[in-house]
A protein has these predicted regions:
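Nucleotidyltransferase catalytic core that binds NTPs
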Residues: 1-127
Length: 127
């Protein structure tokens, strides 16, 4: 039985690799709807010097995965966190149970989203 109405995941996904796919699958086991926040091209340039694929390309690829129900753009912040995405989803779905599930580059020590306590459960190392 799925625990949450919505599970939020986020990342650059530039390019998508098997670790991302495992995260998508893991997120889908937690909730009925998976919302994937894709970081902006500007965020990718700041993180790694360039964007391999544009936001539009990454979004189209992400939307094709059966585990992802919706892809959202969100405003990047100075920490590279998905806090603005969490706020955006919570405003769009105020009556839903929501979890944020991430993996990859994030750990308990470098995840600013972990401090976001506005009714959203937090999972690290999803998938």
């Amino acid at each position: 039985m799925k625990k949450y109405d919505i599970v939020i995941i986020s990342g650059g996904f530039d390019p998508v690799h098997k670790g991302h796919v495992r995260m998508f699958k893991g997120a889908k086991t937690l909730g009925h709807k998976v919302i994937c926040g894709a970081n902006s091209d500007k965020w990718l340039v700041n993180k790694k010097g360039k964007a391999f694929m544009s936001f539009a390309e990454r979004s189209e690829i992400l939307e094709a995965f059966e585990y992802i129900d919706e892809v959202m753009a969100f405003k990047d912040d100075s920490e590279g966190s998905a806090i603005n995405l969490l706020t955006q989803v919570q405003q769009l779905y105020p009556n839903c149970t929501i979890a944020f599930a991430n993996g990859g580059d994030r750990t308990n020590k470098n995840s600013p989203e972990q401090g976001y306590e506005n009714r959203i459960m937090w999972y690290n190392e999803c998938g």
